[in-house]
């Protein structure tokens, strides 16, 4: 049976998802081919960010100095509690195996993943709790390589509080805007990641 419309809405920028999907597919394809160079070009275009893709130890230390001591103390308190709970929770999980019927064996085996990519919403608003909850719990779970990724706020880069929160456990902190799909998923892969807000 054919659809009959009483009234058909006109397509607008908000409702015409088809063209948006085509644009996003093109961006992702460009990033996949051009990697860091293209992602930085796209970040400059959309995010107005022209800084480094990977934050250096000096940039991380600089960010720390921009945060009031009271906020740092509160973040340490939260981090410690998140870590304590995550470790206690991990302690309640165990490998198990059982035979449901003769010859039908089932069970679970806990195997930590080798790498985790933690997206932290950022841009104009700092989501400090997202940084702590994702990065800290990954560390407690035994993940060896943790990458934290957050969008910049223009040329200011990542909010200093997000950098500080993620730096407690992440191996790399990153700051570029166009494509989270570029985030490395294993150690020693190309070291670049990005996200869009």
Which residues does each PLM region occupy?
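Generic short N-terminal amphipathic or hydrophobic helices
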Residues: 26, 41, 59, 145, ...
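Conserved small-residue-rich beta-alpha loop and adjacent elements
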Residues: 99-164
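Short acidic/polar active-site loop segments enriched in Thr and Asp
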Residues: 35, 114, 144, 172, ...
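Short basic, glycine-rich beta-strand/loop surfaces that mediate nucleic-acid
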Residues: 162-168, 179
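Low-acidity, Ser/Thr- and Arg-rich intrinsically disordered low-complexity segments
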Residues: 169-175, 182-196
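Short acidic-hydrophobic, aromatic-tinged amphipathic segments that line or gate anion-handling sites
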Residues: 3-7, 173-178
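N-terminal Rossmann-like NAD(P)+-binding subdomain of aldehyde/semialdehyde dehydrogenases
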Residues: 1-114
């Amino acid at each position: 049976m054919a659809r009959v419309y009483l009234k058909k809405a006109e397509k607008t920028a908000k409702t015409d998802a088809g063209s948006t999907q085509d644009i996003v597919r093109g961006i992702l394809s460009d990033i996949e081919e051009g990697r860091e160079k293209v992602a930085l070009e796209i970040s400059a275009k959309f995010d107005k960010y022209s800084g480094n893709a990977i934050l250096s130890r000096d940039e991380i230390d600089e960010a720390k100095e921009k945060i009031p001591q009271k906020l740092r103390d509160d973040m340490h308190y939260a981090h410690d509690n998140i870590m304590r709970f995550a470790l206690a929770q991990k302690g309640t999980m165990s490998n198990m195996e059982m035979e449901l019927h003769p010859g039908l064996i089932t069970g679970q085996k806990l195997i930590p993943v080798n790498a985790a990519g933690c997206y932290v919403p950022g841009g104009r608003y700092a989501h400090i709790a997202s940084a702590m909850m994702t990065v800290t719990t990954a560390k407690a779970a035994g993940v060896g390589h943790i990458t934290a990724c957050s969008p910049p706020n223009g040329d200011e880069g990542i909010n200093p509080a997000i950098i500080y929160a993620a730096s407690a456990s992440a191996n790399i902190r990153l700051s570029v805007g166009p494509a989270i799909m570029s985030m490395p998923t294993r150690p020693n892969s190309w070291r670049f990641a990005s996200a869009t807000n």
